[in-house]
C-alpha cells in the first residue's frame, strides 16, 4: 500500500434506484451529475458540509426506463444521458430541460460519450451497434462493419484531440479501437475470457483499461495497439476510471473499490464502506459507478443501495 490513502467523507442520498453513472465537471467543481435506475438524473450541489456533502439541486426527468450513463460537456452547460428506453437525451443544465432526443437505437442504450471538442457523440447499445451523432441529434454514422457481435457495453472517446479514437467493449469479450477520421476499425484487443463491462481511456489518450466478468483489468497501448499488462481485480469489474492527475486506475468491483498505482502495479487502497442495512440474502451493496473530481482529489462512487459515497485523497 502506498502512502496516499483515501478517507471517507460521506454519502449523498436522493436516488431511489442504483446509481449507474457519475459525471464531474472541470468548469463547475461544485456540481456533479448522477444517473440512476430510478429513471432520473440528479444534479447535485456540493456543499462539503460536515453533516451533508451535498444536496439535489435539480432532478432531470424524461427517460422512461433506467438511465445507464451520463456525461457533461466540457463547458459544464449540457449533459448527455443514455437509457434503456433506447434513446439519448441532451439536457440544458441551466434549465433542466431536454433540448434534444436521439432516436435510432433499437434496444437499450448502455453507454454514451462526448468527443474532446463536444461536437460528436458516440453511443453503444444492446442492439450491437455503435452510433455517432452530432449535437443536433442526427445520427451521422452507424458502425456495423466489424462491430461487436454481442451487446456493446461501453464506448469512450479518447480525450486526446490529436489522436481521435473511440474505444469500445462488449459482451463478445473484445475491446475495439476505432479511427474516427475514417470510421474504421483500427485494432481488436483480445484477452478477456468473459463479457466486458467497462473501458476507460487515460487522460493523455495513450492507454485504455478494460474489465468485466473475468476479474482481470487489462491495459492496452492505444498507440502501439498492444496489450501492456493485466491487474488482478479479484472480482467482477463493474467500472474503471483513470485518475486525472495521478498514475492511478480505480476499479469498482463486485466486492470493493480498488485503486491501483500503475507505476508500481500495486494497490493504493481498497474501499469497503460500512453498510448500515444489508440487503436481501445478506448481499452487500455493490459499487457500479465511479468518477474522480476534475482535480483528482475526490472519488465519487455509486452503489446498488442507491447511495453515492464520497472519498478524499489524504496525501
Swiss-Prot record:
Disruption phenotype: Lowers the growth rate and completely impairs fruiting body formation. Lowers transcriptional levels of genes encoding adenylate cyclase and protein kinase A catalytic subunit. Also weakens transcriptional responses to sexual development induction by some genes related to fruiting body development, including 4 jacalin-related lectin encoding genes, 4 hydrophobin encoding genes, and 3 functionally-unknown genes. One of its GO terms (molecular function) is translation regulator activity. WD repeats lie at residues 14-54, 62-101, 104-144, 147-188, 191-230, 232-270, 282-315. It holds the Pfam family WD40. Keywords: Conidiation, Repeat, Ribonucleoprotein, Ribosomal protein, Sporulation, WD repeat. It comes from the Eukaryota. Coiled coil: none annotated. Component of the ribosome, a large ribonucleoprotein complex responsible for the synthesis of proteins in the cell. The small ribosomal subunit (SSU) binds messenger RNAs (mRNAs) and translates the encoded message by selecting cognate aminoacyl-transfer RNA (tRNA) molecules. The large subunit (LSU) contains the ribosomal catalytic site termed the peptidyl transferase center (PTC), which catalyzes the formation of peptide bonds, thereby polymerizing the amino acids delivered by tRNAs into a polypeptide chain. Belongs to the WD repeat G protein beta family. Ribosomal protein RACK1 subfamily. This is Cross-pathway control WD-repeat protein 2. It comes from Flammulina velutipes (Agaricus velutipes). The lineage of its organism: Eukaryota, Fungi, Dikarya, Basidiomycota, Agaricomycotina. The gene is cpc2.
